[in-house]
Amino acid sequence: MNDILKYLLRSHILLAIYSFFFLYGLYFEYPSSWVYALMISFGIIGIYNLHRLWKFKMGRLPNSINDWTVLNKKSIYVLALIPTLMAMLLYFWLYSFDQLQNILTVFCVLTSVFYVKRIGKFALREIPYLKVFFVIAIWYLLFFIYPYWIFDSPQPWILGFLFLMSILIPSDIKDIYFDPHEMRTIPQVVGIEKSVKLIQLVL
C-alpha cells in the first residue's frame, strides 16, 4: 500500500475527510453546516487517535498496527490532541446551549472513553454482541440526531440507521481476525459471507 494512503487510512484522516463531505452533503443548505461537519471531522481524528494511543499503551494493537504506531507516534499524538481541542472549542462556542444536547454529548464522550478503557473485565467494545451497536449509537447521534436539533432538519431515521449498519459491519469484518472470539461480533457469529449478504440486504 502506498505510504501516504496508508498514513491517511491508519491516522483516520481519510475517514474524517469522507465524514466531512458526507455531513456537508446532507445539510449543505444550512449556512453553518460546514462548521458542524468540520467539528465532527476534528472529533473523529482526535478520538480515534486517542483510542490508538491508549491501545498502544496497553499492548492491545495488532502487530502490524503496533509497528506502524511506533514509527508515527509523534504525529499521532499531534492528531490526537489538537483536533480534539479544536472540536471541543467549536462545540462550546457554538453548540453548548441546549441542556439535553449537552447530556447526550457527555454520553458520547463517556462512551468513547470506555469503548477502549476497560472497567473490570471488559471495555464497551468487548462486551459480547454489542460492539457495532455502541458505534452505531454514537454515529447516529452525530449524523442525524444532532443535525435535527441544530438545523431543524427532517431526518430519514430508519434509513439512517440501516445506512450506518451497512457501513459499520465491514469494520467488524476487517477486525474479525483481531477481535477476541468472546466479543461475538456479527461476522464472528454468522460468518463473513452471511455478514456480506446482510449488508447487501440492508442496502
What kind of region is each of these model predictions?
Residues 132-176:
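Functional transmembrane core segments of multi-pass inner-membrane proteins
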Residues 20, 24, 40-54, 86-88, ...:
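Central hydrophobic cores of alpha-helical transmembrane segments in multi-pass inner-membrane proteins
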